Design a protein with these regions (language model features):
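Transmembrane helical bundles and short interhelical boundary loops of multi-pass, membrane-embedded
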Residues: 235-297
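Membrane-interface loop-to-helix entry segments
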Residues: 81-96, 157-179, 206, 210
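Membrane-water interface signatures at transmembrane helix termini and the short loops
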Residues: 189-225
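Transmembrane alpha-helix/helix-exit interface in multi-pass inner-membrane proteins
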Residues: 40-56, 119-143
Length: 300
């Protein structure tokens, strides 16, 4: 799908070689593809550097939370529903390209572009802090529940890209930076589908999805120069990940405290989504051409 979008953007660029927006979009599509290759190499390195994964701790946290991805997988990973789940999970990159095009051509701002660049840099660092692969890779019988006692850590050979769910964080960023009712509605639908697909496919634990919410809010707050909000959401992310890395038994042994903490984390995300303003939107600086113009920052 991304290859078709790249071809379409290339042809569109040739129709008006003086429109700088077309070159930017073409470059961004290439950047997305290049990042995919680089990220795969980095994850392979992290897999070798961190052979012991924390999937057992994340599974135990999900159990203590009272929500795991296994029942959802058993419900949806069959027949046409399984195919739909797979397609939704794979649709993230094409949707990102669409958002890049909308940002350049329709919304005249670069907020989502810079947000995803920040996320791209931060993702491998977070993966290294809590290396985990996802239930589909840690438990060979997924979506059937594990029959044996699961150790807190285990030796696995798979990409440690579970914690946090960058798929969900990215889908939430698409919603935060969407403009217009239609695209906000589409982004909300895509976010819901992404959450369901990441869990049902066994790519992520429930805790991965929960922590993805403050990750997205941290990126958005940083980009929009909301220092206090960025500190709050960044601290929430670090607190979760450091606790999971160093003392998950503290949360596992106190399920009520775990559930309350998870609920407060999601509420913080909802607060940011409901009350943020768009004053931090960053317009593209024009380079000339018939469409080049400064676009005033949007308020409200």
């Amino acid at each position: 799908m991304v290859a078709l979008e790249m071809l379409a953007v290339g042809l569109w660029m040739l129709l008006d070689p003086h429109d700088s927006r077309r070159y930017r979009l073409f470059g961004l599509v290439w950047l997305v593809c290049l990042y995919g290759l680089i990220c795969r190499a980095v994850l392979h390195f992290e897999d070798i550097a961190f052979p012991i994964k924390l999937d057992g701790s994340l599974y135990a946290l999900d159990k203590a939370l009272g929500l795991t991805s296994f029942p959802l997988g058993r419900l949806l990973l069959h027949g046409w529903m399984g195919a739909v789940i797979s397609e939704i999970y794979a649709a993230l990159l094409p949707v990102i390209v669409v958002w890049f095009a909308l940002s350049l051509i329709v919304w005249h701002e670069s907020g989502i572009i810079w947000a995803l660049l920040i996320e791209m840099v931060a993702a491998p660092c977070m993966y290294a802090l809590v290396p985990a692969c996802g239930p589909a890779y840690a438990f060979g019988n997924f979506p059937a529940d594990p029959l044996l006692t699961i150790p807190a850590s285990m030796r696995l050979s798979a990409d440690p890209n579970a914690m946090p769910s960058i798929h969900v964080a990215t889908a939430l960023l698409l919603l935060l930076f969407a403009r217009g009712r239609f695209w906000k509605g589409f982004a909300l639908f895509f976010l819901a589908g992404t959450i369901i697909s990441t869990l049902a496919s066994g790519e992520h634990y429930v805790m991965d999805v929960i922590i993805a919410v403050p990750v997205a809010c941290f990126v958005a707050a940083t980009l929009e120069k909301r220092a206090r909000a960025a500190v709050v959401y960044g601290s929430v992310v670090l607190a979760w990940m450091i606790t999971i890395r160093t003392g998950p038994e503290l949360l596992i042994g106190a399920p009520m405290a775990l559930r309350l903490s998870a609920l407060l984390t999601l509420m913080l995300g909802a607060i940011y989504g409901c009350f943020r303003k768009n004053s931090g939107a960053l317009p593209w600086v024009p380079y000339g051409g018939p469409q080049a113009r400064m676009v005033p920052e949007q308020n409200g």
